[in-house]
Amino acid sequence: MKKNIEPCYYGDYLQLDKILGAQDLQSEKYGDGAHEEMLFIIVHQVYELWFKQVLHELNAVIDTFNQEAVKDQQLTQVVHRLQRIIQIQKLMNDQIAIMETMTPQQFLSFRDYLVPASGFQSIQFKRLEISLGLKREFRIDFDKQSFYNRLTDKDRALLENLENKPSLFELVDKWLSRMPLLKTEDFDFWQYYKDAADEMLKDDHHTVSTSDMLSDTEKRQEIKDLQATMENFDALFNETQFEKLRGEGKFRLSHNALLSALFIKQYSEEPIFNLPFQLITALTEIDEQLTIWRYRHAMMVQRMLGTKIGTGGSSGHHYLKKTTESNRIYLDFFNMATFLLPKSALPDLPESVRRRLGFYLQ
């Protein structure tokens, strides 16, 4: 690194004149200055700064996966950057508590001056969602079209262009799909797994059927739920059935990618799987933190507005609550716990399989 040729002054370097002069209160324009509007603006500006940093990290991760091979050193850097995103998300979630120091009455003192501006017009947040993998076809109905109609032509074009680029979800799916399905002449992991899973599910069925703690109605419901679980297990070994369930929205990962991710989680203690497991865990936590952010945001809006519509014309709390439930990205990684078996039920990996996996995971 070269030394600075010219002296660098703190305020100039951070362009504080621009940043600290960017709080233009709408309420003051109408001679009705609201003290709390300053807090409202600063909190949202800080969110946008953090979104910019998250996108900086996320785009670097996407660039890494958008190549033919990802080496261990690169994967280490990817995991580090994803973990940084998680820490930023936690900070953003905590920041909601600062907004909650404003009372509903204080918010109403300037709210009407903001129409039709709305948080769902945050282009950086939408870029973040799309880049992670929440593209239009996976959104709730309001977001699929109505949202885009409320943007400027420039912002709409930017997001529509991003929709056509590979997301991190798609790239990770492709990376996971490169792993072999662990079937050789002397070792068939998935046959071991299927036999162990069948035995486990039979035991579960027997436990429910013979339980003295459950009523007949409860038993019927438990067995119905168990049958749904069995259907999902069966789909692991039947790609046609898997694609049918995938078309119904029960899975989003491709068949090969899901099997690879499941294998990595089953053998997460193996040194060769350490980084892939950390990657899957980090993506799971990013989705979790995003869900927490949406939920806390929805609760804050309900606290401030009740059932009023939002400034952008959405249904306010109802809209935000629905996005919390529906706009999940890496849900397959959460649901994978359904398919995990006890270590005692799994075979040891032959050395030949370890070597083969080492080649495909790079």
From Swiss-Prot:
Binding site for heme: H297
One Pfam family it belongs to: Trp_dioxygenase
Coiled-coil region(s): none
Signal peptide: none
Keywords: Dioxygenase, Heme, Iron, Metal-binding, Oxidoreductase, Tryptophan catabolism
Catalytic activity: L-tryptophan + O2 = N-formyl-L-kynurenine
Annotated InterPro entries: Trp/Indoleamine_2_3_dOase-like, Trp_2_3_dOase
Membrane-crossing residue ranges in chain numbering: none
SUPFAM superfamilies from the UniProt entry: Indolic compounds 2,3-dioxygenase-like
Biological pathway: Amino-acid degradation; L-tryptophan degradation via kynurenine pathway; L-kynurenine from L-tryptophan: step 1/2
Cofactor binding remark: Binds 1 heme group per subunit.
Keyword Metal-binding recorded: yes
Names of required cofactors: heme
Binding site for substrate: F40, I41, I42, V43, H44, R111, T311
Highest taxon above the source species: Bacteria
Protein function: Heme-dependent dioxygenase that catalyzes the oxidative cleavage of the L-tryptophan (L-Trp) pyrrole ring and converts L-tryptophan to N-formyl-L-kynurenine. Catalyzes the oxidative cleavage of the indole moiety.
Family as reported in the entry's similarity comment: Belongs to the tryptophan 2,3-dioxygenase family.
Subunit and partners: Homotetramer.
Name listed for the protein in its UniProt record: Tryptophan 2,3-dioxygenase
Lineage per the UniProt record: Bacteria, Pseudomonadati, Pseudomonadota, Gammaproteobacteria, Alteromonadales
